[in-house]
């Protein structure tokens, strides 16, 4: 399955990614509804990574456009108090959105989207002031499941399998096989990269370009990743495609692309690498040419 992913991601201003085939939105930054227009009505599930305003301020209009019984479903970190406040305000502000369902999530919780598809949350340390027991920022992994016939039964005839299914139950004949279709880091420091291993598509933030630049910043601000760290880590993982976003607007297109190519060469990254440039909406990202 080649997913149709459209997104906008500029640090400080707005971030969102729409996965069309899954009717799913990752974050809901400003401008999503007027950008997607009627396509925004296809969104059934919204997964918010954290409460920073550049990830949630497009939600009011999007929710009003999509509001119907039980949809859209909005999922968010359980201790992100500003998002809970946004739920309360939106229901007071607009009667039409009262049927929207809001779901707080903890770490490693699963959300079943359909029989063969679920999303799993993963806590990160983006929010500096979060206590160890608090979940204020999440990444997400999207899994597709299929039932595969157990090796003990592969040589049996259809009739024999039917009889066994009646006797033992169909579920006893198969194993569940999970495929990690897509992973989304949200805003996060460069950490716990092993959790993204074996994903087909990783969307990861790269706010700054180099470790040296990150080292000069204040340590009490919310934490982010660098392009250098991400590509160094991805080089050791089994990932099919990398999408980089959340670049700071301080960088030009030329600076970002040159750095991507330089670090891909330095760390021997050979998988396709796509990027979302600051200030630009990128349509159908996976069908565009990779930068490397």
State where each predicted segment sits.
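Active-site-proximal loop/helix segment associated with metal-binding centers of metalloenzymes
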Residues: 117-197, 201-206, 210-211
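Active-site neighborhood of phospho(di)ester-bond hydrolases with catalytic His/Asp-centered motifs
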Residues: 25-29, 44-54, 76-77, 183-188, ...
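Acidic/glycine-enriched edge-of-secondary-structure segments
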Residues: 17-25, 39-52, 206-225
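Conserved beta-strand hairpin/beta-sheet module of binuclear metal-dependent hydrolase folds
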Residues: 1-39, 138-142, 148, 175-185, ...
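Metal-dependent catalytic neighborhoods of phosphoester/phosphodiester hydrolases
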Residues: 58-65, 85-92, 252-261
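Active-site neighborhood of divalent metal-dependent phosphoester bond hydrolases
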Residues: 72, 79-106, 250
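Binuclear metal-ion centers of metallo-dependent hydrolases, dominated by the metallo-beta-lactamase
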Residues: 97-114, 191-292
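Active-site metal-binding motif and surrounding structural segment of the metallo-beta-lactamase
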Residues: 32-77
């Amino acid at each position: 399955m080649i997913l149709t992913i459209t997104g906008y991601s500029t640090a400080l201003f707005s971030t969102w990614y729409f996965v069309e085939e899954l009717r799913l939105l990752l974050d809901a930054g400003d401008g999503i509804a007027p950008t997607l227009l009627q396509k925004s009505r296809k969104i059934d599930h919204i997964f918010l990574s954290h409460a920073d305003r550049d990830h949630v301020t497009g939600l009011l209009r999007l929710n009003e456009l999509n509001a119907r019984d039980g949809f859209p479903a909005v999922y968010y970190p359980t201790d992100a108090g500003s998002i809970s406040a946004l739920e309360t305000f939106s229901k007071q502000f607009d009667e039409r959105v009262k049927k929207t369902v809001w779901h707080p999530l903890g770490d490693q919780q699963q959300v079943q989207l359909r029989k063969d598809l679920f999303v799993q949350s993963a806590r990160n340390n983006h929010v500096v002031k979060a206590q160890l027991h608090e979940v204020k920022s999440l990444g997400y992994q999207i899994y597709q499941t299929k039932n595969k016939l157990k090796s003990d039964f592969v040589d049996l005839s259809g009739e024999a399998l039917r009889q066994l299914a009646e006797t033992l139950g169909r579920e006893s004949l198969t194993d569940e096989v999970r495929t990690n279709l897509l992973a989304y880091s949200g805003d996060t420091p460069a950490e716990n990269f092993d959790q993204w291993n074996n994903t087909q598509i990783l969307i990861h933030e790269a706010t700054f370009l180099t470790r040296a630049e990150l080292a000069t910043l204040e340590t009490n601000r919310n934490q982010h990743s660098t392009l250098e760290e991400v590509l160094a880590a991805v080089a050791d993982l089994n990932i099919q495609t990398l999408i980089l976003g959340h670049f700071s607007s301080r960088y030009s297109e030329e600076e970002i692309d040159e750095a991507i190519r330089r670090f891909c060469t330095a760390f021997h990254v050979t998988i396709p690498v796509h990027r979302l440039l600051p200030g630009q909406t990128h349509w159908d990202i996976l069908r565009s040419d990779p930068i490397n």
